[in-house]
């Protein structure tokens, strides 16, 4: 179930709107539109697993859905909400640290967007938890009755959620591309600014050296050349520092990517463990029902086998 919340974190951090379109949507079976969303990044794969999990839940029986909507699940949702908000805060602080060299105006704008996304995320997660609790109450109130209407309502909500997730995921891809391009452009712009500032100085030094070489003695030429070499060495030093800073930023981006991959692997293992736990819940019930059915069939066969012998005894 952590996959669900991580997917919500990613989509809502991109600044997507949490509003659901009120107009009706055509009936579409789950799984028909998903192939058009493809991705190789860990968060994109997690988004696909999240929707597969929702589709799997919808196909379960009433009894299994009652188990999933128990009080324990609500408590787990609350714990996941707290953990998710901690991860969002840590990620926001880390991203703000990565944006340190950028202009103050850009940094303030990005920080404001992230804070707004964090607030929207908390509100949306609370809404999801309320919807789950409401659906659980409706199922309990209709115990022994048909739940087709509730299933239809759940399917409609999932279709709207899918449309919003697809839209937000595409928006997130664009935002990530823009942020990455902006970071690289900022680094290149810093190197270009250094070259622009040192270029006139170097050119001025060359002109002055040529003038001094024309009007002065060999000693003055040597001094001018030494000054030129000094300026050149300073320019190379500053250029090296700029390249080192760019390489450091790239290494930090690689560390962030490795951390995201590690967290994705952990969440995948937790999802597999949760699926195994669900399987262990229902396998004993299925085996018990099979045993009871086999016993019932055996009793019926035994009764049918003994019925012809009992009839003559009653006639005598």
From Swiss-Prot:
Region (8 X 22 AA approximate tandem repeats) location: 79-254
Entry's Gene Ontology cellular component terms: chylomicron; extracellular exosome; extracellular matrix; extracellular space; high-density lipoprotein particle; intermediate-density lipoprotein particle; low-density lipoprotein particle; multivesicular body, internal vesicle
Protein name: Apolipoprotein E
Similarity comment: family membership: Belongs to the apolipoprotein A1/A4/E family.
Cystine pairings recorded for this chain: none
UniProt region (Homooligomerization), positions on chain: 265-316
Organism the protein comes from: Orcinus orca
Region entry Lipid-binding and lipoprotein association, spans: 209-289
Signal peptide extent: 1-18
Post-translational changes noted in the entry: APOE exists as multiple glycosylated and sialylated glycoforms within cells and in plasma. The extent of glycosylation and sialylation are tissue and context specific. Glycated in plasma VLDL.
Molecular function as annotated in GO: cholesterol transfer activity; heparan sulfate proteoglycan binding; heparin binding; identical protein binding; low-density lipoprotein particle receptor binding; phosphatidylcholine-sterol O-acyltransferase activator activity; phospholipid binding
Gene from which the chain derives: APOE
Gene Ontology terms: biological process: acylglycerol homeostasis; cholesterol efflux; cholesterol metabolic process; chylomicron remnant clearance; high-density lipoprotein particle assembly; intermediate-density lipoprotein particle clearance; lipoprotein biosynthetic process; melanosome organization
Sequence repeats: 79-100, 101-122, 123-144, 145-166, 167-188, 189-210, 211-232, 233-254
InterPro entries: ApoA_E, Apolipoprotein_A1/A4/E
Binding sites annotated in the UniProt record for heparin: 161-164, 228-235
Region (Specificity for association with VLDL) residue spans: 277-289
């Amino acid at each position: 179930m952590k996959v669900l919340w991580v997917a919500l974190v990613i989509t809502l951090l991109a600044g997507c709107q949490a509003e659901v379109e009120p107009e009706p949507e055509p009936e579409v079976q789950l799984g028909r539109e998903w192939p058009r969303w493809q991705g190789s990044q860990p968060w994109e794969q997690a988004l696909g697993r999240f929707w597969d999990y929702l589709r799997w839940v919808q196909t379960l029986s009433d009894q299994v859905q009652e188990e999933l909507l128990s009080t324990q699940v609500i408590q787990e949702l609350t714990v996941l909400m707290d953990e998710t908000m901690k991860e969002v805060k840590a990620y926001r602080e880390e991203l703000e640290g990565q944006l340190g060299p950028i202009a103050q105006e850009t940094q303030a704008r990005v920080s404001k967007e992230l804070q707004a996304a964090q607030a929207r995320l908390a509100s949306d997660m609370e809404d999801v938890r309320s919807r789950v609790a409401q659906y659980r109450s409706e199922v309990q109130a209709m115990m022994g009755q048909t739940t087709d209407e509730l299933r239809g309502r759940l399917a409609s909500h999932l279709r709207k959620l899918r449309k919003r997730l697809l839209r937000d995921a595409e928006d997130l891809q664009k935002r990530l591309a823009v942020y990455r391009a902006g970071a690289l452009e900022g680094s290149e712009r810093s190197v270009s600014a250094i070259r622009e500032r040192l270029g006139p100085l170097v050119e001025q030094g060359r002109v002055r050296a040529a003038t001094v070489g024309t009007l002065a003695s060999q000693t003055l030429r040597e001094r001018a050349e030494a000054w030129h070499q000094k300026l050149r060495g300073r320019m190379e030093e500053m250029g090296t520092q700029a390249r080192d800073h760019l390489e450091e930023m790239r290494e930090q981006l690689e560390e962030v990517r490795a951390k995201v991959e590690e967290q994705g692997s952990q969440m995948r293992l937790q999802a597999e463990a949760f699926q195994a736990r669900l399987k262990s819940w229902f396998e004993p019930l299925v085996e018990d029902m099979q045993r009871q059915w086999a016993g019932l069939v055996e009793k019926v066969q035994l009764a049918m086998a003994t019925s012809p012998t009992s009839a003559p005894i009653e006639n005598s």
